[in-house]
Amino acid sequence: MAAAMAEQDGSKGSARNRGGVQRVEGKLRASVEKGDYYEAHQMYRTLFFRYMSQSKHIEARELMYSGALLFFSHSQQNSAADLSMLVLESLEKHEVKVTEELLENLAKLFSLMDPNSPERVAFVSRALKWSSGGSGKFGHPKLHQFLAITLWKEQNYYESRYHFLHSSDGEGCANMLVEYSSTRGYRSEVDMFVAQAVLQFLCLKNKTSASVVFTTYTQKHPSIERGPPFVQPLLNFIWFLLLAVEGGKLTVFTVLCEQYQPSLKRDPMYNEYLDRIGQLFFGVPPKQSSSYGGLLGNLLNSLMGSGEDDDVEDGQEDSSPIELD
């Protein structure tokens, strides 16, 4: 009986708190609608720190999120970006469990920010760090997917491709690459767009996405005749490579790389990626040097990070340094 009454009182208290937040929101919204942007912004900040000091983290986060959306709708980029950062601060300090809804909210804020603003760069960096939640150093794959789709819509294909690499959306990546190749690439390089993506997915030990991106891209690209086999030797190499990865036989991998050297010489990075793939899938011992150097080192260190130990699903479980652009 006492427990039931306590629970009922708690529910009433929660309802009162929510009602109070809604009343405050109404006043702030009216202030923004009147054009009192500076005053409204300062009030949002004051309420944020007041709620946080009272451990009302959810109320603080929800108020900042709705406020950011309101400022974005009035083209107040600076105020909106500031409140977006406070949303992140509430998540970081409250140690909130990562959920798809929260990731969608963060992606929504990202999509509304000025693509050229420094605040956007800072926001996405912190958002990815928070979303990793200790389960991976690259950020949550779902957040990467949301970011990739937003950047794709903005026709920022280069950055979109990076985030697709760290998502599990091989199909989305392929569709973006088809558009990227068709609108920005040379017809003679249609095979190189997907070859690079497949090799980089494999360097991340993500066999599933590597296979999906290859199949989807080759089926949907208007300049690629249906295969296999394909007209382009490089596509045949990638097709055979994906089969070899499943089999895990070093002799097959070695012969394959030797036979297709003319195609692999089209990009100096291909053989570097294949060295890494040989280590991951075919038991090839790593080179003598303890770390990669030169151009490969820069690329691989940006793709895989510094090599902390992480238990991540298909795509990110090995910890040798590789970070790709």
Curated annotation (Swiss-Prot):
Residues 1-22, 306-325 are annotated as: Disordered. It holds the Pfam family GET4. The lineage of its organism: Eukaryota, Metazoa, Chordata, Craniata, Vertebrata. Gene3D superfamilies: Tetratricopeptide repeat domain (1.25.40.10). Transmembrane segments: none annotated. Component of the bag6/bat3 complex. It comes from Xenopus tropicalis. It is found in: Cytoplasm, Cytosol. GO terms for biological process: protein insertion into ER membrane; tail-anchored membrane protein insertion into ER membrane. Belongs to the GET4 family. PANTHER family: GOLGI TO ER TRAFFIC PROTEIN 4 HOMOLOG. One of its GO terms (cellular component) is BAT3 complex. This is Golgi to ER traffic protein 4 homolog. Keywords: Cytoplasm, Transport. Residues 307-317 have a biased composition (Acidic residues). As part of a cytosolic protein quality control complex, the bag6/bat3 complex, maintains misfolded and hydrophobic patches-containing proteins in a soluble state and participates in their proper delivery to the endoplasmic reticulum or alternatively can promote their sorting to the proteasome where they undergo degradation. The bag6/bat3 complex is involved in the post-translational delivery of tail-anchored/type II transmembrane proteins to the endoplasmic reticulum membrane.
